[in-house]
Amino acid sequence: LGDVYKRQRYVHNDICFPAQIVIGEALAALESGKYDPDKVAIATGKYIGDCRLTHYAALLRKALDDAGYPQVPIITNDAEDAHNVHPGFKMNLKTAMQIAFGLPMIDALEELLRKIRPYELEPGSADAAFDKSIDAVIGGLRQGGIGGMKKGFKKAIASMLSVKYDRSKPRPTVLIVGEYLLNFHPGANRDMELYLENNGLEIIEARMTDVIRKTYFYQRSQQREYKVHRPLPTKLNNSISDAFFKLAHDATDKIAKAHPLYTPPCRMPELVQASDPIIHHTFDAGEGVLIPAEILHHAKRGCRAFVILQPFGCLPNHVVGRGISKRLKELYPDAQILPLDFDPDVSFANIENRLQMLIMNARKPRTS
């Protein structure tokens, strides 16, 4: 979090915590001296239009200009650039297809890592195999595009198969969901995953693929069910993108099933429609229905501990995170649902106290 504190002179401290993290880290990288500002670009995620995530590129542009890096371009994952703040790059179909194929593969490897690491017989072997696996997928992509990535993924699964483990005494499981930067950024969430694992739990994480795919799925559902008008090119793009994610899932499942611990994920249509009793599957604010959908999906499979990570003051995720807790408790009275708010000044002692209550309850023998 030092990057955030040191660079708050370029980002107002009332802006979203994820924005402070992203912009702070970008500036820290430039100030480190490792990169030539005249030969580097910064990539940042950007999607949906109901929260300040839409404005991260503009906030980053202002911070870079104020910090003395006006020449550094910004790359985002969409084609919108109304103010010409990041010229020189437009994501093409080939790049989008490679991303669509890569995400399910990374999700599969991370799932295997979380199922193996708490039970590994040789400390550090799971992390080492995972790092080797990621290198294999990236190397395959560089050498042979999507075909090369598939070959690299086969090598990755072989690496994960080489790790020895003993799952004869399974741990209680805990699902981590919430705003996706907090979910996947250990610096932002204070190494939440490692902390819970070190305290005797097995971690289940939401999938990054669903975070990206949901935009295309929602828009198609809104077009069909509510007759929302969108231009024909947008409709075609949504249909093609959603179909390509399905192909990517199919290819990933076909290769990953070689590992006995791999479980094919619940696909987007089935996953989100299961949340209809709480939030309709076409609702797309914040993380949309992914938070209740993931919780319901894993609750049906025996998980009873859930942590929802939220940036402080993030209204969309308060609605679909903390706001759904009461209804979920009605459906699963024995479930623990712990919403946690994060900002740069949050006390880890406060977070730890609340986590310890969840950990102690999760580790209690469950009564039938």
Where are the regions that the model predicts?
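An N-terminal assembly and electron-transfer interface module characteristic of large anaerobic redox
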Residues: 2-368
